[in-house]
Amino acid sequence: MLDKTYDSAAVEPKIAKAWDEADAFRAGVNAKPDAETFTIVIPPPNVTGSLHMGHALNNTLQDIMVRFERMRGKDVLWQPGMDHAGIATQMVVERQLMERQLPSRRDMGREAFIERVWEWKAESGGLIFNQLKRLGASCDWSRERFTMDEGLSEAVIEVFVSLYKEGLIYRDTRLVNWDPKLQTAISDIEVEPVEVNGHLWHLRYPLEEGVTYQHPVAFDEDGNATEWETRNYLVVATTRPETMLGDTGVAVHPDDVRYKGIVGKHVILPIVGRRIPIVADEYPDPTTGTGAVKMTPAHDFNDFDVGKRQGLRQVNVLTADGRITIKNNEDFLEGLDHPAALHGAWDRLEGKDRFEARKLIVEMLEEAGLVDHIEPHKHMVPHGDRGGVPIEPRLTEQWYVDAKTLAKPAIAAVKEGRTNFVPKNWEKTFFEWMENIQPWCISRQLWWGHQIPAWYGPDGQIFVERNEEEALHAAIQHYIAHEGPMKAYVEDLLENFKPGEILTRDEDVLDTWFSSALWPFSTLGWPKETPELDKYYQTDVLVTGFDIIFFWVARMMMMGLHFMKDADGTPVEPFHTVYVHALVRDKNGQKMSKSKGNVIDPLELIDEYGADALRFTLAIMAAQGRDVKLDPARIAGYRNFGTKLWNATRFAEMNGAISSEGFIPEAASLTINRWILTELSRTIRDVSEAIEDYRFNEAAGALYRFVWNQFCDWYLELLKPVFNGDDEAAKRESQACTAYVLDEIYKLLHPFMPFMTEELWEKTTGPGRERTTLLCHAEWPAAFYADDAAADEINWLIDLVSGIRSVRAEMNVPPAAMAPLVIVGAKALTSERLDRHASAIKRLARVENIEHASVAPRGSAQIVVGEATACLPLGSLIDLGAEKLRLEKAIAKVDVERERILGKLANEKFVANAKPELVEAERERLVELDLQRDSLGVALSRVSEAG
């Protein structure tokens, strides 16, 4: 006999151990002969990471598919692994060194520091895998990969060298997102916009001597200028005055009539003295500010593009750590005549932190009368998500991938339907990103990561090879082949050769996303031709969040299509489907963040409710394209769903339903059993199709309805007289049928609730119900049974009883009161059903007797069931007048509250200023009140008709 209650805390580790000891999730286990493969690669979590709700949703959905396909007999591989997370890991280890008062990264040197990181990884990295196991993730854990593993590193080197030699990787000087704290380039996804209360400084840039223009200062109601003033300066606005030191132009729109006469003229840059041109460009908006925009091509992405078009110089005035550098800066000093009057200002600014320099520059401009005005300005400032400080667009030389060329086959793969996005609307986002793709900056100024396989000769010549030996060989061939001073220099070095004398390796490492882009094939052994690569590539579906479609999904497609070919040489996509799941938000629909204090820890939920309850909640709420609003109360509700199944199993055991030996579904004789077998087959079909179509919420919903409503609430309830009766044949059939259906339920629910179902599968074994495999290896049920007549009959009975119960509840009939039931207009089939199920109707609907009549009795509530009308004469059971009055008062109360909420929601100030969760709560309350009013209105109509 099952324990009275299910203890998830005790069961989950026991089941996890059983799976582990059985090697239950090894690739190919449980596969049928010549089975087709089903492959998923896990989005590799950071080695520094811990499980969050996004991981929980993402991996729950993957696990549902993996367990489903494994039970269907496919050759399944769910490939696990971790990302080395360059910046995050380096920061964690550096912080640990500081906390332990050990030598810093710089003090210990590169080799010792990297060794220290590997030690940290062995001690503390990979915590998230144990957390994923607690969630029930059925990966092939024996195949765990790490992006810095030897094999994966070999793949990274091979790809870099190949792309470089094809001209698809190159060095270039461009603007990058630069983190002055970490002193490295970072990717867009590592940039977090933060709203700050700043200022907009409107600065006056003097026109060169003798140049003036007429600037409008008054306008009529149609916006036409009526007054002008002569100006010898332009007003430009900026939120970053410190960058003005690098200004090399002022842009105005070519159609802006205010400035037509001075395009091509120059302004004199304050503090610097540089003569910079006024250029006409489409970028400035004439309706914003003065319409004149200062151009700092070395410190702003938009200005960089304008500068390229207009031929403006690029002057970098910030060091790697965000300090002003001008006095020994050749780019800054070029073309300046070094007026002594400015040297004092330069001395004050040299070496100052950017924000300190901002204050000094504003002071200097105010002293010179060149600050037109200052206004408060709330705006978004990009910050590095790791360093936590404002990032700087910075002009540096970096390594780039020609993403535009690699993107073309990926775009074609989606357009031609070889890779599909689910939901499909994400394809539009994919195309927008890919068709406007920029060169991909792949170098990072870090130590932890894949060091770029590039070496520099004494003259700066680049040699990109798989290792230093190959690079040295290439360098020698290069220099010896060309007559000149370098040939003699290298020949001299070779006579007394010492490692490192001829070549110097690039110190940068690759962007973490570079190695992640190879994940679908590097984890299978590429560039070696392994059996796993041949069998499991192409993978089937990638499950991901929308935020990394560009950073990861698109890049995997670019790399996969470039490097993976079939036997005919045709490029092969890394996956045929990309399933994009939504965000997990809090119960009020707010994005979870530490600053809001609304982060929900999935491990705490597992501790409290069990992994199965969390998984089922996430699945049933995972509607395509709709964010998950996670309320712990919902998880508690779905824990109750598990309890319902547990109790149903106990009920079955107590009533002898412990074996399905000899049970043949097609031979079932009782209508109730034929009905549940039909509904079971319908559920099998619905669940299977929904999982195949990535409609996880519909699959979970179908299971919930079948298990809770049809099986527990109706089937077991309708069987009670059979279990307690004297018809032994009917009892034996029903006991066997119940055991059979329960086994099928365990199988169907297993992908969603693996721990409880595996426990039930084990605990219900016995003679005639032997378990030859773990449930996770049991065969997925087949939808083969159909008896529409039985289904129609029992569903008719359910509709009738449910209708009577609803009327009783709506009209406030006391639960113990027995009501008469009068049937009007029943045809022969309905009359036969009434006779067959009379005892069930009386017991379940609290009906005293059933009569037939030609007209509905006066004072009765009526329910239409099929062609007949079921009438409940309630005048003798309730005071119809008092009930009518009660309902009218309830409706009036609802109306008052509805009007109050409608008034608040119509108030623009409330909607604009109240906390979003409060506004959302009021909207949800309004929906509840509308539903209440509808129900009360139906009840009032029934009472009025009955009276």
Swiss-Prot record:
**Reaction catalyzed:** tRNA(Val) + L-valine + ATP = L-valyl-tRNA(Val) + AMP + diphosphate
SUPFAM superfamilies (UniProt xref): Anticodon-binding domain of a subclass of class I aminoacyl-tRNA synthetases (SSF47323), Nucleotidylyl transferase (SSF52374), tRNA-binding arm (SSF46589), ValRS/IleRS/LeuRS editing domain (SSF50677)
| Motif interval(s): 'KMSKS' region | 591-595
Residues the record lists as binding ATP: K594
Positions occupied by motif 'HIGH' region: 45-55
Where's it mainly located?
cytoplasm
The protein's matches in Pfam families, at most eight in alphabetical order, are given as: Anticodon_1, tRNA-synt_1, Val_tRNA-synt_C
GO CC entries: cytosol
Where in the cell?
A: Cytoplasm
Any one Gene Ontology biological process term?
valyl-tRNA aminoacylation
GO MF, one annotated term: ATP binding
- EC annotation? 6.1.1.9
Q: Which UniProt keywords apply?
A: Aminoacyl-tRNA synthetase, ATP-binding, Cytoplasm, Ligase, Nucleotide-binding, Protein biosynthesis
The protein's job, in short, is: Catalyzes the attachment of valine to tRNA(Val). As ValRS can inadvertently accommodate and process structurally similar amino acids such as threonine, to avoid such errors, it has a 'posttransfer' editing activity that hydrolyzes mischarged Thr-tRNA(Val) in a tRNA-dependent manner.
Oligomeric and partner information = Monomer.
Domain notes from UniProt: ValRS has two distinct active sites: one for aminoacylation and one for editing. The misactivated threonine is translocated from the active site to the editing site.
**Family according to the record:** Belongs to the class-I aminoacyl-tRNA synthetase family. ValS type 1 subfamily.
Q: What is this protein called?
A: Valine--tRNA ligase
Q: Which organism is it from?
A: Rhizobium meliloti (strain 1021) (Ensifer meliloti)
